[in-house]
Amino acid sequence: MDRIRIVGGNELNGIIPISGAKNAALPLMIASLLTSDTLTLENVPHLADVELLMRILGNHGVDVAVNGRRERQEDSYSRTIHFTCRTIVDTTASYELVSKMRASFWVIGPLLAREGHCRVSLPGGCAIGTRPVDLFIEGLTALGATMEIDAGYINAKAPAGGLIGARYTFPKVSVGATHVMMMAATLARGTTVIGNAAREPEVVDLANCLNAMGAKITGAGTATITIEGVTSLSGARHRVLPDRIETGTYAMAVAMAGGDVVLENTDVALLETAVETLRRAGAEISSTNNGMRIKRNGAGIRPVDIVTDPFPGFPTDLQAQFMALMTRSSGVSHVTETIFENRFMHVQELARLGARISLSGQTAKIEGVQRLRGAPVMATDLRASVSLVIAGLAAEGETTVSRVYHLDRGFERLEEKLTRCGAIVERISE
């Protein structure tokens, strides 16, 4: 099992290219099930979750060609992948594959819309709280589907003639459930109105792609999305938007280690709340023609309190990274997690590096320390793993992060990108 070794103390200076967003790429890939034509996606990141989803889609009948060929391209950050699903050959999504990644559960929407029935395993993925599927079930039921849970699977069936447009308001905001209901509604009869919809850029990206395929979606990016159903969708070509979580992660790494880095192929507008929070913490951030520049030279890190919220609030997927940054602040800060009820698993590992963090319910109190000291630590989930890398960049001595398969699910060549900017980061294969 691979490990990441970090020797702390070096500033970061240089250019880091930002990859396509994993959280956008996955639903876009799943949307290929909605059409018999070819969906071409550009700027697809090379990540473990993407590779796994390609296997899952292949089981359903999707032919996948990477960069126009069927061999894998290992030497590029940005890949173009063609997805063609002439016929859906299997409407069952097995536990063996779905349990490995929660987002693969989202195939339930397109399979139900196109074939009228499917059998999908209950999901797995990150061990962050319960993350129930109730919202998915309620949303699809509103479109006329019958849903039955049996032996760990959901058996879903559309009414005769297909799904039927409806008005439905989610009781709480859910990005995944918004993705699924929006995809399913594109082929439903009539008009669907989704209330309390997720407003994340990744939802907008999916809507833009679906519209390019012939869907009629308006309101994406607001709390109310309207979908006029169509009889079929065609192929399209779409570029995956930049990864705002990767952007924020590297921005926090620079704020932690110090230095001057340009993040290319990204957009400050994708994470304005996080950028403003970093400015309050002492980082200098400015827009460039193709991204953003972040500097922290000499100035200390100021304590800042945050509360995670759905977009446009502070992203829960940057909470662990920001907590790592606050361990070196000049005072006391508080991090309150409102999205998931069990997303502080990185706290005990940061404590191994010398962080002073105490928990009270969904709030963490961080007392900044003058120095962190390297130690062996263990990744517990995707975002927690990268928070340990960020802490290691500023820790004295050597930090070794184990179980980095979590890291490979969401960060493309992290050690290579950091090393190019002067960090001492290496992967150790065992």
From Swiss-Prot:
<keyword id="KW-0808">Transferase</keyword>
<keyword id="KW-0131">Cell cycle</keyword>
<dbReference type="InterPro" id="IPR005750">
    <property type="entry name" value="UDP_GlcNAc_COvinyl_MurA"/>
</dbReference>
<dbReference type="InterPro" id="IPR036968">
    <property type="entry name" value="Enolpyruvate_Tfrase_sf"/>
</dbReference>
<dbReference type="GO" id="GO:0009252">
    <property type="term" value="P:peptidoglycan biosynthetic process"/>
</dbReference>
<dbReference type="GO" id="GO:0005737">
    <property type="term" value="C:cytoplasm"/>
</dbReference>
<keyword id="KW-0963">Cytoplasm</keyword>
<feature type="modified residue" description="2-(S-cysteinyl)pyruvic acid O-phosphothioketal">
    <location>
        <position position="126"/>
    </location>
</feature>
<dbReference type="Pfam" id="PF00275">
    <property type="entry name" value="EPSP_synthase"/>
</dbReference>
<dbReference type="GO" id="GO:0019277">
    <property type="term" value="P:UDP-N-acetylgalactosamine biosynthetic process"/>
</dbReference>
<dbReference type="GO" id="GO:0071555">
    <property type="term" value="P:cell wall organization"/>
</dbReference>
<dbReference type="GO" id="GO:0008360">
    <property type="term" value="P:regulation of cell shape"/>
</dbReference>
<keyword id="KW-0670">Pyruvate</keyword>
<dbReference type="InterPro" id="IPR001986">
    <property type="entry name" value="Enolpyruvate_Tfrase_dom"/>
</dbReference>
<dbReference type="GO" id="GO:0051301">
    <property type="term" value="P:cell division"/>
</dbReference>
<feature type="binding site">
    <location>
        <position position="102"/>
    </location>
    <ligand>
        <name>UDP-N-acetyl-alpha-D-glucosamine</name>
    </ligand>
</feature>
<feature type="binding site">
    <location>
        <position position="339"/>
    </location>
    <ligand>
        <name>UDP-N-acetyl-alpha-D-glucosamine</name>
    </ligand>
</feature>
<dbReference type="InterPro" id="IPR050068">
    <property type="entry name" value="MurA_subfamily"/>
</dbReference>
<protein>
    <recommendedName>
        <fullName>UDP-N-acetylglucosamine 1-carboxyvinyltransferase</fullName>
        <ecNumber>2.5.1.7</ecNumber>
    </recommendedName>
</protein>
<keyword id="KW-0132">Cell division</keyword>
<feature type="active site" description="Proton donor">
    <location>
        <position position="126"/>
    </location>
</feature>
<comment type="similarity">
    <text>Belongs to the EPSP synthase family. MurA subfamily.</text>
</comment>
<keyword id="KW-0133">Cell shape</keyword>
<dbReference type="GO" id="GO:0008760">
    <property type="term" value="F:UDP-N-acetylglucosamine 1-carboxyvinyltransferase activity"/>
</dbReference>
<feature type="binding site">
    <location>
        <begin position="172"/>
        <end position="175"/>
    </location>
    <ligand>
        <name>UDP-N-acetyl-alpha-D-glucosamine</name>
    </ligand>
</feature>
<feature type="binding site">
    <location>
        <begin position="22"/>
        <end position="23"/>
    </location>
    <ligand>
        <name>phosphoenolpyruvate</name>
    </ligand>
</feature>
<keyword id="KW-0573">Peptidoglycan synthesis</keyword>
<keyword id="KW-0961">Cell wall biogenesis/degradation</keyword>
<comment type="function">
    <text>Cell wall formation. Adds enolpyruvyl to UDP-N-acetylglucosamine.</text>
</comment>
<feature type="binding site">
    <location>
        <begin position="131"/>
        <end position="135"/>
    </location>
    <ligand>
        <name>UDP-N-acetyl-alpha-D-glucosamine</name>
    </ligand>
</feature>
<feature type="binding site">
    <location>
        <position position="317"/>
    </location>
    <ligand>
        <name>UDP-N-acetyl-alpha-D-glucosamine</name>
    </ligand>
</feature>
<dbReference type="InterPro" id="IPR013792">
    <property type="entry name" value="RNA3'P_cycl/enolpyr_Trfase_a/b"/>
</dbReference>
<comment type="pathway">
    <text>Cell wall biogenesis; peptidoglycan biosynthesis.</text>
</comment>
